[in-house]
Amino acid sequence: MKRDDDYIRQLLLESEASSEPYLMAVQHLSMTTEEQKRHQHAELLCDAGFFEAVNKGVYRITNQGHDYLAAVRSDTVWNKTKESAGQLGGVTLGIMRDLAVGYIKQEAKIKLGIDLG
């Protein structure tokens, strides 16, 4: 299954918005395609350090996950980030974060007059 960066962002947003401390993505024998995608992407989020598995199919967002989400939360920043990643032919989640932070720094300079270098 190919990694879907929009879906990664969606799972992080869902996890943060939930009143529950955990995101469920339980693996079972008769999983639908959507359930497989959810489980696989939750595992990818664990690989990246953005989620921690607290039980089989039960995940919590980590501080690293919150930081990534803070960088990609804005739809404007996210769309610019995806466009830039596409121009590069695809990038790692770390580069996605760096691109998003770069756009946030540009906005800070324009809107606040602060150069965050």
Model-derived features with residue positions:
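Generic structural signal for hydrophobic core residues of well-folded globular domains
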Residues: 15-16, 49, 69-72
